[in-house]
Regions:
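Membrane-interfacial helix-loop connectors
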Residues: 23, 29-61, 74-88, 177-254
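Juxtamembrane and boundary regions of transmembrane helices in multi-pass small-molecule transporters
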Residues: 46-47, 80-129, 234-285
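Membrane-water interface at transmembrane helix exits
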Residues: 11, 42-45, 79, 108, ...
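Transmembrane alpha-helical segments of multi-pass membrane transport proteins and ion-pumping complexes
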Residues: 4, 34-38, 71, 97-105, ...
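Alpha-helical membrane-protein architecture signal
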Residues: 24, 53, 57, 135-143
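Short, membrane-interfacial amphipathic segments enriched in basic
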Residues: 2, 121-140
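Membrane-cytosol interface motif
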Residues: 13-23
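Transmembrane helical segments that form the transport core of multi-pass membrane transport proteins
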Residues: 1-14, 143-220
Length: 285
C-alpha cells in the first residue's frame, strides 16, 4: 500500500525530470532501503534501460528519501539535546535536500532525454491478483539481487576500513580536521564553537549535538551560532564519513570508478546546497 501511494506521488515529478518510471521505482524503494534502490538503478543501467545521466540524477534525488529514512534514528536524540537549535538544523538540512532535488529535476527536464519504456517491468502494479503477483515478483527480484550487492559491499568494507584506520593512526584526519575547523570557525562562528565542529567532524553527530546543547545551556553560544556550527560540522564531516561509510557501499554496488563518481557528484551537490542554505540563514536568520 505504501509503495503504491509513494509511486503515485513520485511519478509526476519523475515525468517532469525526464527520468521515467524505472527511476521512480528506485526512488520509492529508497524510502525503505538505499542499498536496494541503488541495486535497482545499477541493474537498469547495466541492461541499457536508463542512461548514465538518469543514474546520476536519480542518485541525487534519492537523497530525499534517505533524509526521511534516517530521520527517526536522529530526531528524537537530537531535539532533547539542542531543542530549538536542533529543530532549526533539521529544517535547514531538509530545505537543502528540497533545493538540490528541485535543481536536479529541473536540469533533467531541460537536458535529459526520457528513457525508452514499455517493457513489462514498466507497468505499475494494480489492485488486482495480477498486480499483486507483479509486486511479489519485484520483491523476489530484490531478494535475489540484494545478497550479491551486500557481498560486493563487504569485499570493499574491510580494506577501506583498514586504510581509514591506518590514516587515522598516522594523524591525517586529526590534522585535516583541526586545520579545516580552525579556518571555518575563525571566519564564520565564534571560537567557542570549535569543539562542536570537531566533534561533528568525527561523523558521530550525537557528540556534536551534546556539546552544542552544553554550550547553549552555559550561555556561550546563541541558538543561531549553534545552528551554524552544526551545519559546518555536517559539511566538514564529509571526508571521514565518505571514506568510512559511503565509499564501501558505492564501490560494492557499482564499479569502483562509477561508484566514486556517483559519491563525489552527489555529495558535492549536497555540500553546495548546505553552504547556500547556511549562508542564507547566516544573513537573514
Amino acid at each position: 500500500g505504501w509503495t503504491r501511494k509513494l509511486s503515485f506521488l513520485a511519478e509526476p515529478l519523475f515525468r517532469f525530470g525526464n527520468l521515467g518510471s524505472r527511476c521512480s521505482a528506485a526512488f520509492t524503494t529508497a524510502f525503505f532501503s538505499g542499498v536496494a534502490a541503488n541495486a535497482i538503478l545499477y541493474d537498469h543501467y547495466k541492461e541499457g534501460r536508463i542512461e548514465k545521466r538518469h543514474l546520476f540524477l536519480t542518485n541525487v534525488v534519492n537523497q530525499l528519501p534517505a533524509f526521511f529514512l534516517h530521520l527517526p534514528t536522529t530526531f528524537f536524540i537530537v531535539i532533547p539535546l539542542t531543542r530549538w537549535a536542533g529543530a532549526l538544523y533539521f529544517l535547514l538540512t531538509f530545505l537543502a535536500v528540497l533545493l538540490r532535488t528541485a535543481i536536479v529535476l529541473l536540469y533533467g527536464h531541460l537536458k535529459a532525454r526520457p528513457p525508452v519504456e514499455g517493457g513489462p517491468e514498466d507497468f505499475p502494479p494494480q489492485e488486482t491478483a495480477a498486480g499483486r503477483m507483479r509486486m511479489s515478483e519485484v520483491a523476489a527480484a530484490v531478494r535475489r539481487r540484494l545478497p550479491s550487492r551486500v557481498a560486493g559491499i563487504a569485499v570493499w568494507v574491510v580494506p577501506v576500513y583498514i586504510a581509514v584506520h591506518l590514516l587515522n593512526a598516522m594523524g591525517l584526519f586529526a590534522a585535516l580536521r583541526d586545520a579545516m575547523a580552525g579556518m571555518a570557525v575563525g571566519a564564520l562562528v565564534p571560537v567557542e564553537s570549535l569543539s562542536v565542529v570537531i566533534l561533528s567532524f568525527a561523523a558521530e553527530f550525537t557528540s556534536g549535538f551534546a556539546a552544542a546543547g552544553a554550550l547553549m545551556d552555559a550561555g556561550v553560544l546563541t541558538v543561531k551560532q549553534t545552528v551554524l556550527a552544526l551545519l559546518m560540522g555536517n559539511v566538514l564531516a564529509f571526508p571521514v564519513r565518505a571514506l568510512r561509510h559511503q565509499l564501501p557501499r558505492y564501490v560494492g554496488i557499482f564499479t569502483p570508478k562509477l561508484g566514486t563518481q556517483l559519491l563525489l557528484a552527489g555529495q558535492g551537490l549536497r555540500l553546495a546546497s548546505l553552504v547556500l542554505v547556511g549562508a542564507a540563514y547566516a544573513l537573514v536568520g
